[in-house]
Curated annotation (Swiss-Prot):
Keywords, alphabetical: Aminoacyl-tRNA synthetase, ATP-binding, Cytoplasm, Ligase, Metal-binding, Nucleotide-binding, Protein biosynthesis, RNA-binding, tRNA-binding, Zinc
Subcellular location: Cytoplasm
EC supergroup of this enzyme: ligase
Gene assigned in the entry: metG
Cofactor binding, per record: Binds 1 zinc ion per subunit.
Organism of this sequence: Fusobacterium nucleatum subsp. nucleatum (strain ATCC 25586 / DSM 15643 / BCRC 10681 / CIP 101130 / JCM 8532 / KCTC 2640 / LMG 13131 / VPI 4355)
Protein's UniProt name: Methionine--tRNA ligase
Binding sites annotated in the UniProt record for Zn(2+): 127, 130, 145, 148
InterPro entries, per the entry: Anticodon_Met, Met-tRNA-synth_bsu_C, Met-tRNA_synth, Met-tRNA_synth_2, Methionyl/Leucyl_tRNA_Synth, MetRS_core, NA-bd_OB-fold, Rossmann-like_a/b/a_fold
Motif annotated as 'HIGH' region, chain positions: 12-22
Role, per record: Is required not only for elongation of protein synthesis but also for the initiation of all mRNA translation through initiator tRNA(fMet) aminoacylation.
Necessary cofactors: Zn(2+)
Short sequence motif named 'KMSKS' region, residue ranges: 298-302
Length: 636
């Protein structure tokens, strides 16, 4: 494993304000960066702003500023938001900086010297907002931008072109040989399909406006914004400015770009082709996340449903907001932001599960030992089970974090929290406290809980640094928990004899949801085909999370579901293809399944259960469960 780690967000358009989508990407980058630091790696985390282009020039003019003054004015909007979200980046890059201009000029010179740039003329439909030309084969006769929906402009101008088509085969080969180059793998297939349609050469210059980086070998031309913007990653790593830094954080790092799925084409096609031409190492992984809706609807200013991160952290706290975004949706799929969802997570996961574990532990230690650690050498099998489970949790978290499965990593940590809560019920400290001969055993139990809580605080620190530190402080340890490494917490002897624990104080206060009036209509009850309760109890129904969905080969009606039932991944075949043509949208949904049916084979595929559905005049629908309910929850 490489010892260095480089992670980036996209650089955001300076014209806009940060929103829940950009906050999501940047929080994710912050979390993965903090995690890799805890793994003992040297890390570099860069975010920043894309400050060139026609629309920046136009916005500056409309507001009475020069382009540079306009970008200077807009920059604090992003820096202040990231500070409010407790994001600790190593570099905030602006494309107007001299170091970046130097890097862009250098990569252009390298690519040009290789013979991969030529002069031509471009005529096509252009989106000013997205600063992108679109060939007719992407428009299907429309004059609307396929990305933002705005009207396209027919533009004809002299331009310099990059021979991107030359690198199509080399890029396909690289993607094939590096399975994790594009994540999730569904995006990988999308990119491969696009490349196989035939790559066109890329227009990389403009001469109809002036706000950009001049091209030395093309007087009167400035660099096309994407060729400019994408280079920011190597600029930050030290390209053409700090050779040692570049060697460390690009050539000898695991290099990861976190992006939204709308810009996957630029990052997974244009950027790698540029690097192939320049002879520079390609990134190790390009990870594209989904979009967020709000209360089930697309966010838009006209609807008034855009989620403002400032409002959310004011209501729920910064850590609850960070936790919810990364727990609620798998990183590669779309997510829905809802008031009910975040309150449910805060009350259930944070206040009930974690908060109660901390309060119970500290309360009992104060009651039984006056809040002072008493050492004990008594060990029972259940203690070893807890320690063994923690080791497994660390391994699973490492596996999920490597693949950017933030939600699965958090779910794994919460299983350990649940296990410690159950450990209290199993060991019954209140009963041990009544017997003086059991005081040593009581101390051993309480110490397991304190040690476990400190380890939990360490594991959640990348996600919730402020709350993790509060837990540490309440356990009587004031050192900065975000600076610890995994080696610092692997032993179960952190708390020494005489150590004084702190005072318990609620970290996650519960939020009450206003109860809606429930109107019941009484009808005469008739039961047809009654089932004996003993027979019904034989059926085991669980909440399962849909991990992936595909069509069954050779069967138009069948879908193959990969689900997680809280313990195991299983495959279930269901005849739902007709009712879910966009079946990939089902990924990350929680549904109900019968999990103790005899396995059966359908069209050569093993089905290990049955998904429960409803049927009415509108068709057949899966029974979807609130995402706050854990996979594996039993329906009874």
């Amino acid at each position: 494993m490489k010892k260095n780690f480089f992670v980036s967000t996209p650089i955001y358009y300076v014209n806009g304000d940060p929103h829940v989508g950009s906050a999501y990407t940047t929080i994710a980058a912050d979390v993965i960066n903090r995690y890799n630091k805890a793994m003992g790696m040297d890390t570099h985390f860069v975010t920043g702003l894309d400050e060139h282009g026609q629309k920046v020039e136009q916005a500056a003019k409309q507001n009475g500023f020069t382009p540079q003054a306009w970008t200077d004015k807009m920059t604090p909007n992003f820096k202040n938001m990231w500070a409010a979200l407790d994001i600790k980046y190593d570099d905030f890059i602006r494309t107007t900086e001299d170091r970046h201009k130097k890097a862009v000029k250098r990569i252009l010179d390298i690519v040009n010297a290789k013979g991969d740039i030529y002069k031509g003329e471009y005529e096509g439909k252009y989106c000013v907002s997205c600063e992108t030309f679109f060939p007719e084969n992407q428009l299907n006769g429309s004059n609307k931008c396929p990305d933002c929906g705005k009207d396209l402009t027919v533009l004809k101008e002299e331009s310099y072109f990059f021979k991107m088509s030359k690198y199509a085969d080399a890029l396909l080969k690289h993607i094939d040989e590096h399975p994790d180059f594009i994540l999730p793998h569904s995006r990988r297939n999308e990119v491969i399909s696009f490349i196989k349609q035939g790559l066109q050469d890329l227009s990389i210059s403009r001469n109809t406006f002036s706000w950009g980086i001049p091209i030395d070998f093309a007087p009167g031309h400035i660099t096309y914004v994407w060729f400019d913007a994408l280079t920011n990653y190597i600029t930050s790593a030290g390209f053409e400015n700090d050779e040692n830094k570049f060697d460390k954080f690009w050539n000898n790092s695991r290099v990861v770009h976190l992006i939204g799925k709308d810009i996957i084409r630029f990052h997974a096609i244009i950027w790698p082709c540029m690097l192939l031409s320049a002879g520079i190492k390609l990134p190790d992984s390009i990870v594209a996340h989904g979009w967020w809706t709000s209360e089930g609807e697309k966010m838009s200013k006209s609807r008034g449903n855009v989620v403002n991160p400032y409002d959310e952290i004011k209501k729920y706290g910064v850590d609850a907001f960070r936790y919810y975004l990364l727990r609620e949706a798998n990183f590669g799929t779309d997510g829905d932001y809802s008031t009910k969802g975040i309150i449910g997570r805060l009350n259930s996961d944070l206040a009930n599960d974690l908060g109660n574990l901390l309060n119970r532990t500290l309360g009992m230690y104060k009651k039984y030992f006056n809040g002072t650690i008493v050492s004990s050498s008594t060990v029972e099998p259940i203690d070893d089970e807890i320690k063994s489970m923690f080791n497994d949790v660390v391994k699973d978290v490492e596996k999920y974090m490597y693949l950017f499965e933030f939600s699965r990593a958090l779910e794994t940590i919460w299983k350990f929290i649940s296990r410690l809560n159950k450990y209290i019920d199993e060991t019954m400290p209140w009963t041990l406290a009544k017997n003086e001969a059991k005081k040593a055993r009581l101390a051993a139990v309480m110490n397991i809980l304190c040690e476990g809580l400190y380890k939990i605080a360490f594991l959640i620190a990348p996600y919730m640094p402020e709350s993790a530190q509060k837990i540490s402080n309440q356990l009587g340890i004031d050192k900065d928990i975000t600076n610890l490494k995994f080696d610092d917490i692997k032993e179960w002897s952190i708390f020494k004899e005489g150590h004084k624990l702190g005072e318990a104080s609620p970290i996650f206060p519960r939020i009450e949801i206003e109860k809606e009036e429930i109107v019941e209509t009484k009808k005469e009850l008739k039961i047809e085909n009654p089932v004996d309760i003993k027979e019904f109890n034989k059926i085991e129904i669980k909440v399962v999370e849909i991990l992936d969905v595909d069509k069954v080969e050779g069967a138009d009606k069948l879908l193959k579901f990969k689900v997680f039932d809280g313990e195991f991944e299983r495959q279930i075949i269901s005849g739902l293809a007709k009712f879910y043509p966009d079946f990939k949208k089902l990924i990350s949904e929680k549904v109900l399944a019968v999990v103790n049916l005899k396995f059966t084979k359908l069209k050569g595929e093993i089905s290990q259960g049955m998904l429960l559905t409803t049927e009415d005049k509108n068709g057949v629908s899966l029974i979807k469960i609130d995402k706050t309910v854990e996979a594996g929850a039993i329906v009874s």
